[in-house]
Amino acid sequence: MPPPNCLLHVEDTFGPVVKGCGSNFDFTLLFEETILCILPLCVAICLAIFRVTRLWKKPVIFKGCFILPLKLIAWNLVLGSQASVVALFSIRDETRTRASIAAGSIGIVGSAILACLSFLEHQRAVRTSSILVLYLLSTIPMDAARARTLWRMLDGRDPAIAVMVLGATKVCALVTEMLWKCSLANRHELCDAPEESNGIIERALMLRMMPIFWAGYRTPLQTEHLSKLDTKLQNAELRPSEKGPKRKQAPIKLAKEIFFSHTYEFLAPIFPRLCYLSLTFAQPFLVRRAIDYISKPKTEGSGERGDGLIAAYALVYYGIAFVSSLYEQSAVRATTVVRADLSMRIYQQSLLLDRVVDTGDSSTTMMTADVERVQLGVRKLHDAWASFVSVAIGLWLIEAQLGLAALVTLGLIGGSLLLGGYWSGRASRFQKNWMAAIEKRLHKTVQVLKGIKSIKQMGAAPAIKTMLEDERQSEIKLSKKFRLQLIALVTLSFTSLTMLPALGLSVHNAVSDKSSGRILTAQTAFQVMTLFNIVSSSIQDCTSHVMAIMVGLGSLQRIESFLNQHTWTDPRKSIRDASISTDESSVGGTSEKKVLTDVAVKIQNVSAKWTEDGEAIIRDATFDVPAHGLTVVAGPTGSGKSTLLRVVLGDLAPSSGTVSVDDSQVAFCDQTPWIANISIKENIVGALPFYEERYRMALHACALDQDIEDLTDGDKHLCGLNGQSVSGGQKVRIALARAIYSKATLVLLDDCLVGLDTNTERHILGEIFAPRGLLSSAPTTTILATSSPRYLPFANYIILIDADGRIVRQGTYAEIAPHIEQLEHDVLQVSDHAATAREPRAQDSDELPNTAITNDIAFKKGANGDWAVYKWYFGVIGWMDFVVFLFLCLGFVIGVIFPQIYLGLWSEKSLQNQIDTLPSFYGIFFGVGSMAWVALFSACVWLFLRIAVRTAALFHHLILTTTLNARMDFFSQTDSGVTLNRFSQDLQITDMELPLAFVGATMNLLMLIAQCIVVTIQSHYAGFAILAIAVVIGFFHEFYLRTSRRLRVMDIEARSPVLSLLLESLDGLATVRAYGWAAWYLRRGIEVLERSQVPFHFLQSAQVTLNLSVDLFVATLALVVISIAVVQMNTSGGSLGLALFNIVGLGQSVKGVVFFWTSLEITLGAVARIRDFTEDTKSEHESDTKPPVEWPSRGEIHFSDVTLTHSTSLPPTISNLTLDIKPGSKMAICGRTGSGKSTLVNSLLGLVQVSSGIITIDDVDISTLAKDEVRSRFVVLPQESLILSVSIREYAKLFGISDEQEIIQGLKKTGLWQTIEQGGGLDMIASSDTFSHGERQLFAMTLACLKKGKLVLMDEPTSHVDNDIQTQLRQAVFDTFPDSTVLCVTHQVATIVDFDIVLVLDDGKIVEQGDPKELLHQPTSRFAQLYSAGEL
């Protein structure tokens, strides 16, 4: 028996294990002093010196705190203790090794340096020093081990006591270092972001999440409950932008830029991931040591070894929990910063897009789906390389146990990795195609949402629904190719789990049987099985993580291609440069240069077209716009007036010639006013400083002051998406007020006064263009494009354009006036008359107040996680399909678990019995493993190609149907970003995240149940531990879910403003650039993006916290099992090996269950959103009854005491109206804005609510009929023409017109065929750039005239065309529908005389009706008064 006390010659060897004294269970003193003392000291000193140099340059932020003296006292005690240890070793030869003095001396130096670091860290850093805390935490137990060794040496008690005192002083230093100085120093403002102030211990334990979990458990979590993020995570940085053509992109240029922009965040996870890898591979060695310990009889010293084994299990498993937490936090930080970086780049690029190259619609897809995939790739980046390293290490260790048999498994592993890489590449390519299909669908969805009112009016909702569902089916078809690669990768990744042990152990057994007779012991079997489990898990991670990275790279390449698109550059030159050029090019030295202040815009030989292959719209234009006055550009519909203004604006580069403007800011009012989803005041002031007097003058000039007084919230009234909560006239006047307030020296007005009533128009013209008007009296140059000659008398200069886009005449009004009559016939629109005396101050009756612009019906029930969501989801996928899927998953689990049980029994057999049962061994391992593989493949096919595909189509159908069936007030009350989120993010979640979470949760849950049963059978007391810990973890899981669900909701809600702002800025890109508001919009983008970062990061951090709790659960269970085995010593090696092996797998299964179950709960939030949306959104359809086939056969309309309102919360728009309209009559409806004209027509279309009364058409009460059926029977020309990105042929088919010759003849009648034929004929894609506003109305009129019907409804159908075309189209309607009833809402009362009857409305009541010709001869007639008021 070795002596109890160790002598110096034994301890003065490197060891590392002492031999020849005590129980031989100890390190040698030399090993402890070199490896456990000097090495940590050297590392700490190096890091401390580097950190000191960094802190030295930083300012002092903490002063006058009592903690600092405590820290300095503690470190001085450490320094003194180190000196006493050195002193004792110098006088005690019996305990001094070769390294004792060196260790003590380095300790003294190190303590002094660390004390300096502590001083600087306290004064100049918010966070507790990680270097000091880690050093103290790691060396305190090492000092304890060193003291234990010294205590057992002869004459070693005094040095042992000195080392123990050193350890005690280090404990004091550790306590002082961990004190939260923000609170004690009363500097809470420095610690608003816990991630910046928390030390490494708090971060490892995720303590910062506890207040959030507690708040989320007690009350529904709100934004104010979330703490602030640190600056690096929350700040979205702007990047220098390259304008114009981009150089050829490098394949991974964007990836490199992101890496070098966030190098620390990308590299920070490496060290904790390596630690995690090291601790993971300690598990098989622990399994072997435990089985060795149990298999051997007890001897003296067994107790110490058992205690050491328990300590080793605690160190490894709890270490795994903490380093995994630190690693995942680092990965989350990298993901968060990349998300912010990419989102900001996409938004910044969207503001720079050249409209000729791209409209920017793809940016919405990239901002959601693509960024999401890049995030996942970044999150899995370090797991991917670590998995490859893990496979290599695992194979090396397996080879050490199985010998050459391990080489056989190498082929399977290599093949799996090669196939995984190949299929990952294919998956990336298929995913890009899928993303393109999603982008195409979302582009059309955005167009539908913008034109929803026109779609409903024309009864096109069923056709639009079919079109979008066809797009969805095409998208799903492309997704199947990606899903097939995913199935292949998932199946391949689990091949190693089922076949590696079978192949490796079978070959080993075969070789052992024939050669050395070596048996497969329980120690070797379960050590190798643990290694196989780690390798199999790593192979799964390799394939899944590589696929995630490849898919992320594919999305990154899409983003990079988007970022490398040609950006907008101002093609205009400075007017000064143009003047110098003119001077230098003058002949004979005679200067033709004008005084710079005389010319504001100079156009020289300019031709312009919207596409490279298209025909020129403006041809060889040359003119000068005089400074400081009004220049009118006049011409017929489609002549290129708007195009010319876009050229002057710089939004469109001329194909030839030069454009020169004064170096000044430009104000721009588009033909369709762009109104942002902000308040009226913010729309007018924008990015400019606020000046009260200027603001009031702009409001008064545009007749907005009284309107604002009548609004409840005044000028703080939100305008809504595209100005939905203000009237059409108010949109025009807000845009005009914006131009006036800007004080720009160049103002461009693109026919923006169309649709205003006469008095309002006269007021505005007098306020801004009269001799003392705001624009006339200011040093401002105004260019107004119009088809009307009534603005010509106000002009200082006139430019006339013919139908071919050529300038036919230019000059002053005096020069043009003699030719006015001929020009009116050839070029201009004749004077028409507005319909009303003045525009009302209240909102247009056809628009709704924006009471809840960001309202979302999300998670009323689903946010609380009721089981009804699961029941509803299972009902959607089908209960039988779910049972089949569950059965297949169960087959897979049985196929994985049963061979392990058999191996535990087989390894306990004798050599001969093992040899005799080899055939059954091969059969069970290969047969059952193959069954598991087939079951897994079948389950994946069943889920991804059957269940997921069907639910993808169904969920889109539900969202689309609910949206199209929603009442009009829904679209005014709900932000477009919220609705678009349903078609993008919610469907993205249900398409991929939900199926993956579903299969992961099901597989891991079944596997966990099986492993718990195995562990309980092999270690009975562990069953109680499993039950107790499972209850605790269950409570925490529920505690966690309340918060995580709400965080998911907040994440989605915070993302909606980002999408809304993106859509808003893209819609008004020309206006934003004109006013120079791009920087302002970038700041707004930064604000909404930074707000969206907070819930996203905390959602990811909540998942890390949950993983930490699961790891701690597994560590506790492993500790319980090994403690029971050590104490009882009545378990066989095979049983303990099976139990410990399953604990390793159980840990992965528990983490998998919790992770995937939580992911399932969170992703089911999207299902809950869909369910709640479909159940809670009010449908406009109250009846499914179809009218008779021939209805309406006469077109007779009867209103009987009808009261109409847009919402029950609003007063009626029309009250107690009774009206009879005879079949075949042609009725014009006029009145001031807000009088109820459009409401009357929309009531026939079911777009407003009938509070009382009955509306009948041909004696049929229309409230009893299906609204889509009613609308489809009418011919409707809406005020806002619908434009979709489809071909002319497909567009016509949407309205039931398929005869191509009929379509061509109709287009020829309206004069559009020549334009369309040049653009590709019926295959030409319709877009906002294809047609001008007037041509859109002509196109809508063409389709209307091709449709048959007895009732024709027209709402301002010709407001953007010239008078000749108006007359032509009106006559075309009369000729096409001679026997049909025609109702036409119009402001242009001069055209009403051709109708049979005119109906005049005021305040929702009929004030007059009759023959318009007769009424004009009655001086007291209201209609005659309106007509006279419209004369100029």
From Swiss-Prot:
Cystine pairs: none
Transmembrane regions: 30-50, 60-80, 100-120, 160-180, 266-286, 306-326, 376-398, 403-425, 487-507, 519-539, 877-897, 924-944, 997-1017, 1021-1041, 1107-1127, 1136-1156
CC per GO annotation: plasma membrane
Record-linked InterPro entries: AAA+_ATPase, ABC1_TM_dom, ABC1_TM_sf, ABC_transporter-like_ATP-bd, ABC_transporter-like_CS, ABC_transporter_C-like, ABCC_6TM_D2, P-loop_NTPase
GO MF term (any one): ATP hydrolysis activity
Free-text disruption phenotype from the record: Results in a significantly enhanced level of extracellular gibepyrone A.
Glycosylation sites: 605, 677, 1130, 1216
Binding site for ATP: 635-642, 1231-1238
Domain of life: Eukaryota
Subcellular localization(s) per the UniProt record: Cell membrane
Induction per the UniProt record: Members of the velvet complex, VEL1, VEL2, and LAE1, negatively affect GPY2 gene expression and gibepyrone A product formation, whereas SGE1 represents a positive regulator of gibepyrone biosynthesis.
UniProt keyword annotations, A-Z: ATP-binding, Cell membrane, Glycoprotein, Membrane, Nucleotide-binding, Repeat, Transmembrane, Transmembrane helix, Transport
Domain ABC transmembrane type-1 positions: 279-550, 882-1161
Domain ABC transporter, first and last residues per copy: 601-829, 1197-1428
Keyword Magnesium appears in the UniProt entry: no
Protein topology in the membrane: Multi-pass membrane protein
Name of one Pfam family that matches: ABC_tran
PROSITE patterns: ABC_TM1F (PS50929), ABC_TRANSPORTER_1 (PS00211), ABC_TRANSPORTER_2 (PS50893)
Reported function: ABC transporter; part of the gene cluster that mediates the biosynthesis of gibepyrone A, a 2H-pyran-2-one metabolite exhibiting a moderate antimicrobial activity against Gram-positive bacteria and yeasts. GPY2 seems to have a minor impact on the efflux of gibepyrone A out of the cell, but it was shown to repress expression of the key gene GPY1.
PANTHER family associated with the record: ABC TRANSPORTER ATNG, ATP-BINDING CASSETTE SUB-FAMILY C
Protein name: ABC transporter GPY2
Organism: Gibberella fujikuroi (strain CBS 195.34 / IMI 58289 / NRRL A-6831)
Underlying gene: GPY2
